[in-house]
Amino acid sequence: MTSSTAARQLGFEPFASTAPTELRASSDVIHAAYRQVFQVFGNDHVMQSERLTSAESLLQQGNISVRDFVRLLAQSELYRQKFFYSTPQVRFIELNYKHLLGRAPYDESEISYHVNLYTEKGYEAEINSYIDSAEYQESFGERIVPHYRGFETQPGQKTVGFNRMFQIYRGYANSDRSQGKNKSAWLTQDLALNLASNIQTPNFGKGLTGVVAGDRGQLYRVRVIQADRGRTTQIRRSIQEYLVSYDQLSPTLQRLNQRGSRVVNISPA
């Protein structure tokens, strides 16, 4: 359980202090659940004329469960207009994890699975794969409105999911469609390199300090022995050092290898 002070600093206090919404057949609760659903679905404003009145009616009459209601919303034209048509595929998958399972993707294999699923079976199969999953059933069941779970320790949750949740959650009042980076995926590099993401606070994107794999500001000292360039005899080879940023470390090592140089040591600068 996260302390109220930490929750306030990290920007998710409203979620930490609010119990999950369990839907029952009353108009007041349906209205509250509808607000929470679209708060989870990107926190984007839904006009009265855009509301899915037929789905609401089915829910209020008890003909469908909350899970079916969420399915109808996620497969609706409204959801597609907000998060699918103008959004890159990987970013769309990130948002589906956030909206429908309440967490961020853990690793690249989850992204690859959903890319292949959409390519082979289409949009509806992609949405159904989250809602029909065992994870959804265990977390929300038939009557609980999906909510953000990535801020708390959950059974079977990977620790890295906590950090990654803050990459795709940018504050309580933020909308997924208003984020400046909405036109590209947020986690591509960290997932591809299997790195833990920095925790970004909602205020001005300030990163919290600490030992985090993949710190983009870290410099490394690379010591190499130069190639002999075809000489048959050599008494001594000189050792050269390079100061390289984290982002340039891999390309630099590739270039040195192509030149025939031998890396003898890599250490933080």
Swiss-Prot record:
Assigned GO CC terms: phycobilisome; plasma membrane-derived thylakoid membrane
Primary localization class, coarse: membrane
Primary role: Rod linker protein, associated with phycocyanin. Linker polypeptides determine the state of aggregation and the location of the disk-shaped phycobiliprotein units within the phycobilisome and modulate their spectroscopic properties in order to mediate a directed and optimal energy transfer.
The keyword Nucleotide-binding is assigned to this record: no
Stated name of the protein: Phycobilisome 37.5 kDa linker polypeptide, phycocyanin-associated, rod
Protein topology in the membrane: Peripheral membrane protein
Stretches that traverse the bilayer: none
Domain PBS-linker: 2-177
